[in-house]
Amino acid sequence: MCSLPVPREPLRRVAVTGGTHGNEMSGVYLARHWLHAPAELQRASFSAVPVLANPAATSGCRRYVDHDLNRTFTSSFLNSRPTPDDPYEVTRARELNQLLGPKASGQAFDFVLDLHNTTANMGTCLIAKSSHEVFAMHLCRHLQLQYPELSCQVFLYQRSGEESYNLDSVAKNGLGLELGPQPQGVLRADIFSRMRTLVATVLDFIELFNQGTAFPAFEMEAYRPVGVVDFPRTEAGHLAGTVHPQLQDRDFQPLQPGAPIFQMFSGEDLLYEGESTVYPVFINEAAYYEKGVAFVQTEKFTFTVPAMPALTPAPSPAS
């Protein structure tokens, strides 16, 4: 496996971003809180910077104003010539790229943690680009070991040859927290508290790394996308059925060929006609209706994450 280089210096420039989607309220309110009371984000070797990523969408309690911000951090958006007619989120992505990046540069932030909620029953989902992200994989493993009761699942979103497009990709290292189920525009105390605890543990892990802790190699299980499935539709494009009760809320559970996936309004069931077992995620996600996605199909796979050696202390200045 070809892995990205492991950081060889302490991670000093760290950001926690909330409100990338303006109606995912755990991150919105945590970011707002930390902007006024940032002490919770301080550690001995660094202080994380809180960022409210999409202020306009947040003020309107909308996912986005003109364009999904978390799909906007590609070179085509970031490097194109600005115009007065640019969508709000394209302009905001460029601003965030200047603040936290520039993407793929030596000046970029060392780590960005991006906070999200989902209406799907994803539980505690850890989202990274790929298995090659060694620091992120060790962080995911640390969270799994710290909170076995949460069954933290790892979702690796980037397909082969695809450019990374989400907010945390502007940093040298990044991770997304995706917690649910929580309705859009609603703040649940349990989800809020869980996210707050996870953020603290992420920062604690970075502090461990900065202080010279070594992390051994390990085997990791994760999920990667292999396709998407739309709802059944009429000729006019309206829904003709919805997610079957036997599939609803079964994110990360195996879906076997022949199992029901949709219940038609006419009464019959539609069955999964694939040839192999898949693991659906983001099942019946509210934000994906407009994208024509009833659920994302993933495959489960196992891979080896190489060891992350301890940082070598910087030499003391000559006296």
UniProtKB/Swiss-Prot annotation:
List positions binding Zn(2+): H21, E24, H116
Question: GO CC annotations?
Answer: apical plasma membrane; cytosol; extracellular exosome
What are the alphabetically sorted keywords of the record?
Cell membrane, Cytoplasm, Host-virus interaction, Hydrolase, Membrane, Metal-binding, Zinc
Q: Name one Pfam family in it.
A: AstE_AspA_cat
Q: How is the cofactor bound?
A: Binds 1 zinc ion per subunit.
Catalytic activity reads: an N-acyl-aromatic L-alpha-amino acid + H2O = an aromatic L-alpha-amino acid + a carboxylate; an N-acetyl-L-cysteine-S-conjugate + H2O = an S-substituted L-cysteine + acetate
State its cofactor: Zn(2+)
Cite the GO molecular-function annotations of the record. Answer: aminoacylase activity; hydrolase activity, acting on ester bonds; identical protein binding; metal ion binding
Top EC category: hydrolase
Places the protein is found: Apical cell membrane; Cytoplasm
**Subunit structure and binding partners:** Exists as a mixture of homodimers and homotetramer, both catalytically active.
Please state what the protein is called.
N-acyl-aromatic-L-amino acid amidohydrolase (carboxylate-forming)
